[in-house]
Amino acid sequence: WAYKKNLAMSISGSVPCSLVSRVFNCKPYTLIDDPQAVTYSTIANLSYKSFCMLYKVPDTYKLHPKSIVLKSLKEWAYLAPSVFTPNISVLADYAITPHRYLFVREVSVGTSNYASQTADSILQIAKLIPSDMPVLLSLEKKDKYKEYPQNWILLQEPLQDVHSLIYYSAGLISSGDSMAREASLLGVPSYYLGIRYSMPANAVAAEVGSLDNQQTMSIEKWIEKTLSLQENKPLLQEEVRASINEKFVDIHAYMYNLVTQHQQ
């Protein structure tokens, strides 16, 4: 794709793109959010500049000299108020009421990201959720659906607007950390059932929003607390979103300015 093209810069988060950019004398900028990743040092070495998309980095972490902390999380690029507008009409397909249902996500542990994680984390805590509470179930291994409570609503994915379903939920429980972070940035109380407790991005999402895990609060207490906040959730949600928007940089404006600098 780069052959015989006059490219001034590239933006990616991968080793191959950065390597190709170097070959074609193009300045590679990279975006990463996990300085624990095995590819982090390689990506940073190949970069002209590497943006570490974390609101803050723990003192125990030593970043690469080319790394610049960008005060945001990557999910904010598509969840910021200037970009994402929740659509309440998506709830009609499921006959659910705003802030009166839970969204749960069960990831497959067959991938490299979750290889060391216990399988069926959501299934193991399903009985703790009140039987009269509507639940939307996002399930990667859909062949296991019959093992979950039959009154739970199985989502037929991919969905056109999954983030609106998360936004209007009373809370989200996920065995994967990506969707737990998304919920937190949407101002939705979230609970992460996985094991990546020390990942900086998860710590940031917990600090600026509401993300708990098995080390910070029991799932029983979280369910009780979340259900007790249903009445006040819309107001609290907007306060959280506004607070995050003040703390995080505008990623789109930042990247636009970066690109225009190379056009001058």
List the predicted regions and their residue ranges.
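Donor nucleotide-activated moiety binding/catalytic core segment of transferases
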Residues: 1, 142-179
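Active-site and donor-binding regions of nucleotide-sugar-utilizing enzymes
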Residues: 1-63
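A donor-sugar binding/catalytic signature common to diverse glycosyltransferases
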Residues: 9-20, 28-32, 164-202
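Short, polar loop motifs at secondary-structure junctions
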Residues: 13-16, 53-59, 138-146, 196-198
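A nucleotide-sugar donor-handling region in carbohydrate enzymes
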Residues: 49-117
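Catalytic donor nucleotide-activated moiety binding site of glycosyltransferases and closely related
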Residues: 104, 126-156
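Catalytic binding pocket for nucleotide-activated donors in carbohydrate/polymer assembly enzymes
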Residues: 185-230
